[in-house]
Amino acid sequence: MHTRTQPFTRAAVLAAAVLLVAPLSACGQIPFSGPMTTQTREIAEVDAVDLRTSGDLTITIGEEESLTITASAVAISALTSDVDEGTLVLDYGGGAFGVSRISYDLTVRSLDRVQVSGSGSVSGAGVLGPEGVVEITDSGSLALTDTHTRDLTVRIDGSGSVTLEGSSVSLDLMMDGSGDFSGEDLRTQKASASIAGSGSAWMFVTDTLRASVSGSGGLTYAGDPVQVATDVTGSGTVEIAAPR
């Protein structure tokens, strides 16, 4: 009796597993674990990047554009890397979603825009050109060093964080949510900041600062700017940084 039911039991378990995985696959909810693999993909004429996955993106400046992706063998087949009008969009295909660690290594000549639309992270040095835009629209993070721009725009919508080091003639910061901007090591001449929600920002400004805070957020600034204009509504604050 036991020997006859054992094959049936194994078959039943297998069938149950298939039934369990099938709806998950249909929804893209596949656990992307397993051995890691690396894949190189062709890209060309990239001047912006939008990271929409939970991966870690490292950007390097170089003459030859290239993209390398490291992830599990299952996950990597579902990852897309399309260039749309100069913007490299790093996403999941078909709504796929997983838990595998994803690493991107991107080499470009220069970028005008870096955007994080998911929970991923971006890092790089000397990435932006004379006019740069940095944007976070979720819970992701972005850290750029050796930044030297003429006009720099930073938008943080959500709980993400942006850290910038270097210099810019002008800086335009817009925040909505609980995000964080660390610009104490970004030397700017003219800066404007609009903070809505509970976010916090840190700036270094030497000439002119215009700041608007609504909600419970706060702006801290250093650099002893010549002109400062503030507009605060709610419990938010605009304050001078304590001497280091």
Q: Where are the predicted features?
A:
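Alpha-helical interaction segments
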Residues: 17-18, 205
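Acidic (Asp/Glu) and glycine-rich low-complexity loops/linkers
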Residues: 2-14, 20-135, 146-150, 155, ...
